């Protein structure tokens, strides 16, 4: 039976910022004494990291990986750009991608509880505390993403600005179109579409845009209003929808046109299934 209460455990976690497992271990070692437990964690090099937990984190990196396990994306923030490029910090971020893929996770809280692939004796949360101790800054795992990659898919990743913006594009119909998928991912980072296609734009967004367009042409004849509104919607779709956008490397063709051209050349039924785009802090 434990020699400490849940309240003591909660206090130790709040005071040190150290993970649940190590806090339990510390309290068991200290026979429930909070101060002795803090000393125990300090000897392990963990407790002082907790003091950094409330520092603001505006810098960081977005990292992505695709392999046979699936596709993973994680954003991890720190206080300065200097630490964002630190090898110790980058190794921690890389290990998170392995953890997401190993455990098929998209939840930051769930990720914090799994045992780290980088240091199997520590949970991800505990390794984060150790890494904070090493680099001397607060670290925040802001968001995580995982999705399986199916057979017959090609996946492309593009990272811009040393991990400040990252896109992943998923194509169906072929496993041999990675170069095309990467080109589309690069385009996504440059053009930042909000939606995949016209059909995927939510109804409430369409209604909002229609209200805006209507207010801009109020007082004009109905047939003029309809014509102008159609033109404005066309421009909206060309700006907001990936498949309607002009390809950044060849503005004479849309992304849908690019896909159609590649499908005709390869004889494969290519299609952009979905994409993920993350920008630092967005």
From Swiss-Prot:
<keyword id="KW-0648">Protein biosynthesis</keyword>
<keyword id="KW-0963">Cytoplasm</keyword>
<dbReference type="GO" id="GO:0006414">
    <property type="term" value="P:translational elongation"/>
</dbReference>
<dbReference type="InterPro" id="IPR001816">
    <property type="entry name" value="Transl_elong_EFTs/EF1B"/>
</dbReference>
<dbReference type="InterPro" id="IPR036402">
    <property type="entry name" value="EF-Ts_dimer_sf"/>
</dbReference>
<feature type="region of interest" description="Involved in Mg(2+) ion dislocation from EF-Tu">
    <location>
        <begin position="80"/>
        <end position="83"/>
    </location>
</feature>
<dbReference type="InterPro" id="IPR009060">
    <property type="entry name" value="UBA-like_sf"/>
</dbReference>
<dbReference type="GO" id="GO:0003746">
    <property type="term" value="F:translation elongation factor activity"/>
</dbReference>
<comment type="function">
    <text>Associates with the EF-Tu.GDP complex and induces the exchange of GDP to GTP. It remains bound to the aminoacyl-tRNA.EF-Tu.GTP complex up to the GTP hydrolysis stage on the ribosome.</text>
</comment>
<dbReference type="InterPro" id="IPR018101">
    <property type="entry name" value="Transl_elong_Ts_CS"/>
</dbReference>
<comment type="similarity">
    <text>Belongs to the EF-Ts family.</text>
</comment>
<dbReference type="InterPro" id="IPR014039">
    <property type="entry name" value="Transl_elong_EFTs/EF1B_dimer"/>
</dbReference>
<protein>
    <recommendedName>
        <fullName>Elongation factor Ts</fullName>
    </recommendedName>
</protein>
<dbReference type="GO" id="GO:0005737">
    <property type="term" value="C:cytoplasm"/>
</dbReference>
<keyword id="KW-0251">Elongation factor</keyword>
<dbReference type="Pfam" id="PF00889">
    <property type="entry name" value="EF_TS"/>
</dbReference>
């Amino acid at each position: 039976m434990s020699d400490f209460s849940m309240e003591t455990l909660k206090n130790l976690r709040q005071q040190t910022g150290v993970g649940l497992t190590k806090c339990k271990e510390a309290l068991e070692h200290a026979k429930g004494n909070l101060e002795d437990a803090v000393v125990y964690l300090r000897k392990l090099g963990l407790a002082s990291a907790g003091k950094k937990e409330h520092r603001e984190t505006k810098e960081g990196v977005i990292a992505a990986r695709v392999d046979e396990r699936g596709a993973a994306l994680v954003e991890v923030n720190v206080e300065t750009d200097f630490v964002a490029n630190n090898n110790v910090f980058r190794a921690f971020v890389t290990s998170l991608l392995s953890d997401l893929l190993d455990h098929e996770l998209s939840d930051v809280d769930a990720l914090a509880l799994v045992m780290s692939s980088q240091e199997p004796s520590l949970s991800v949360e505990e390794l984060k505390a150790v890494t904070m101790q090493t680099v001397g800054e607060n670290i925040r795992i802001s968001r995580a993403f995982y999705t399986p990659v199916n057979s017959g898919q090609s996946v492309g990743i593009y990272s811009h600005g040393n991990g400040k913006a990252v896109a992943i594009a998923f194509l169906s119909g072929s496993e041999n179109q990675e170069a095309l998928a990467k080109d589309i991912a690069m385009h996504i980072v440059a053009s930042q579409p909000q939606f995949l296609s016209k059909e995927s734009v939510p109804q409430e967004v369409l209604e909002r845009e229609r209200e805006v367009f209507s207010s801009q042409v109020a007082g004009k004849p109905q047939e003029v209003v309809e014509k102008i509104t159609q033109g404005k919607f066309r421009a909206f779709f060309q700006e907001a929808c990936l498949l309607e956008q002009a390809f950044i490397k060849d503005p004479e063709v849309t992304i849908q046109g690019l896909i159609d051209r590649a499908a005709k050349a390869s004889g494969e039924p290519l299609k952009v299934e979905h994409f993920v785009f993350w920008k630092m802090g967005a």
